[in-house]
Amino acid sequence: MDKIQRAAADLAQKYGLNAPAMARYTDLASEMGELGKELLLGSNYGADELKITDDTAKEMGDVLFSLAMLANSLDLDLEECFDKAIGKYQKRFGQTGQIGSQT
């Protein structure tokens, strides 16, 4: 478990924030929406160049916290998951010249 997951787990234990994985997934989706809203606002809905604000950074932090809480509820190590994803993308790029799936 990495530093971020450990900090999230400590906070959850301290304040009784444990919840089932589906609740954590829903929270993550909600936080992603809030980040998306900040990106839209920061670019005037795509009309202007994106300006990163303190609110953008706060929402990114909320997304990261929610992802760590979801991973903890699933007993998954985010760093291991990330390493597997990087390996998958490197292999795919080596085979196809792209990282996107062909499904």
Where are these regions (language model features)?
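Flexible "arm" and connector segments at domain edges
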Residues: 1-60, 64-103
